[in-house]
Amino acid sequence: MPATASASPPTSPSPTASGNSDLRPEQGSAKVASKAASFTSQVDDPHYSSSHAGSVNVHGWWLDDHDNFTGMKARVTVYLWAKKGSQWVQVNKIPTKKNPVTVYAGGGGGKRASGSVSCRSHKPTWYHGQVDVDIIDAIDTSNRPNSHDVELNCQPW
């Protein structure tokens, strides 16, 4: 199930789904508006690619839950993190053809960003995804929700 986060600013920083709050920018960023309209940022859990054998993928998208942004697009960027020792390391390359993308709300093919990394060995490695959604020409928060941590037999180094 995808991780979700409301774009309405919280009153205090909350932990991320993966417990790695150090990867999320602070909630008090200058981009945050007290009356920002809400939308939902979503990121799926890292998983083996069904179209490119030997790689791990993560996808991010956004939903306009209350029709606040009808006809508007957002720039969606996904980050794929792998744990190396005690540190989380970003392993996907940005920019690519599919990341970031500027898309309408909805998710699915053509409405989401995709990040991936190739496996160099089959050693167990922890991964998590992160998504950043920026509505074009609108004020939104700097939230970057994380997926769950997932252990996969794919080491990227």
Per-range role (PLM):
Residues 10-157:
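Post-signal peptide N-terminal regions of Sec-secreted extracellular proteins
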Residues 1-12:
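Secretory targeting and sorting signals
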